[in-house]
Swiss-Prot record:
Membrane topology (UniProt): Single-pass membrane protein
Species lineage: Eukaryota, Viridiplantae, Streptophyta, Embryophyta, Tracheophyta
Matches recorded under InterPro entries: APRL5/7, Thioredoxin-like_sf
Residues of the Thioredoxin domain: 37-157
Protein name per UniProt: 5'-adenylylsulfate reductase-like 7
Length: 289
C-alpha cells in the first residue's frame, strides 16, 4: 500500500511539471534555479576538498606567478628517501581536506633543482611554506597534526571545515621514529640497511657534536694540567730524591762494611803470618843449641 502511495505522489509531482503549458515549465525551472543557487551559497564549489597537487620546480614558479589574488598556497617540500618526510605526507593530505580554501602543492626533492629550494628559503626537509601575494611564512615546530592546524589558523585566519584524526599507520615503513624501531626489536644493522641516509645523518651529527665538544674538553684538560701537574711533579721529584739519597746511603754503608771486612781479613792474615814466623824462629834456635 505504501508503495502505491509513493508512486502516486511521484507521478503527481512529475505531472505538475509536464509541458501542459509554457508557464508551468518556467515556474519549475525558476524553482530549480533558486534551489540550486541556495545550495551553492551554502556549499560553494571552492570548498570541496581536493588532494594536493604534485608539481616540479617549473610548474611551481608558474603557479606562484599566476597567484595575483590574496589566495593562500601551502607548499610541502619533502624527499621520498627520508622516513621523516614520508611521515609528514599523509598529514599534509589531511590538511588539504580540512582547509579546502587553501591550494596545497607538493614538491619532491628529485623533481626540482636546488636553486628552487634556495629561492624559497628551504634548507632542510621536510618543510611547509605558506605563501600569498604579500608574505611567505615557513613553519617551524613539531610536525604533528594539531600543531600544523594551529599554524594554519594563526597564519591565514581560516578555520578548518572539519576536524580529522591522524589515521596513519605506524609501521616500520611509514613511521620514522628511530626509538620505535629499536623498541620493536630492529637491530642497528637492519636500520642501516633500510635507511642508510638516516645513519649517515646521525654520524654527521655525532661528528659535528664531537668537533664542538673536544676543543672545550681540551682547554679544560690544559687548565687542570697547569694547575695540578706541577705540584704533583714536585712532590714526585722530592720523594724520588729522598729515595735516591737513601739508596746512596745504603750503598755507602755497604761499601764501608765491605772495607771493614777486608781490613779484618788482612789483619787476621798478618797476625797468622807473624805467628808462623815466630814459631819457625823458635824451632831454628832450639836446633842450633
Amino acid at each position: 500500500m505504501n508503495l502505491w502511495v509513493s508512486i502516486f505522489l511521484v507521478s503527481a509531482i512529475a505531472g505538475s511539471c509536464l509541458p501542459s503549458g509554457f508557464a508551468y515549465v518556467d515556474v519549475c525551472n525558476h524553482e530549480f534555479e533558486v534551489f540550486r543557487s541556495v545550495i551553492e551559497q551554502k556549499c560553494p564549489r571552492s570548498l570541496y576538498p581536493s588532494p594536493p597537487i604534485e608539481v616540479d620546480g617549473d610548474l611551481l614558479d608558474k603557479l606562484m606567478d599566476a597567484n595575483h589574488g590574496n589566495a593562500y598556497i601551502s607548499i610541502l617540500f619533502y624527499t621520498s628517501r627520508c622516513p621523516f618526510s614520508r611521515a609528514v605526507r599523509p598529514k599534509f593530505d589531511v590538511l588539504s581536506s580540512m582547509f579546502p580554501h587553501i591550494t596545497h602543492l607538493i614538491v619532491e626533492q628529485s623533481q626540482a633543482l636546488p636553486s628552487v629550494f634556495s629561492r624559497y628559503g628551504i634548507h632542510s626537509l621536510p618543510s611547509i611554506l605558506m605563501v600569498n601575494q604579500t608574505m611567505k611564512m615557513r613553519y617551524h615546530g613539531p610536525k604533528d597534526l594539531a600543531s600544523l592546524i594551529q599554524f594554519y589558523k594563526e597564519t591565514t585566519g581560516l578555520k578548518p571545515v572539519q576536524y580529522m584524526d591522524e589515521g596513519e599507520p605506524t609501521s616500520l615503513d611509514t613511521d620514522g621514529n628511530l626509538i620505535t624501531w629499536l623498541h620493536n626489536g630492529s637491530s642497528i644493522r637492519e636500520i642501516a640497511e633500510r635507511e642508510p641516509y638516516m645513519v649517515l645523518a646521525l654520524m654527521f651529527l655525532s661528528l659535528k657534536l664531537a668537533i664542538l665538544i673536544f676543543p672545550i674538553m681540551g682547554s679544560r684538560l690544559k687548565t687542570l694540567w697547569a694547575l695540578y701537574v706541577p705540584h704533583l711533579s714536585l712532590g714526585i721529584l722530592g720523594e724520588t730524591s729522598q729515595l735516591f739519597g737513601r739508596a746512596l746511603h745504603m750503598i755507602d754503608v755497604r761499601r764501608l762494611w765491605i772495607k771493614l771486612r777486608l781490613t779484618k781479613t788482612r789483619n787476621f792474615q798478618e797476625r797468622a803470618k807473624n805467628a808462623l814466623a815466630s814459631v819457625s824462629l823458635g824451632k831454628s834456635s832450639s836446633q842450633s843449641a
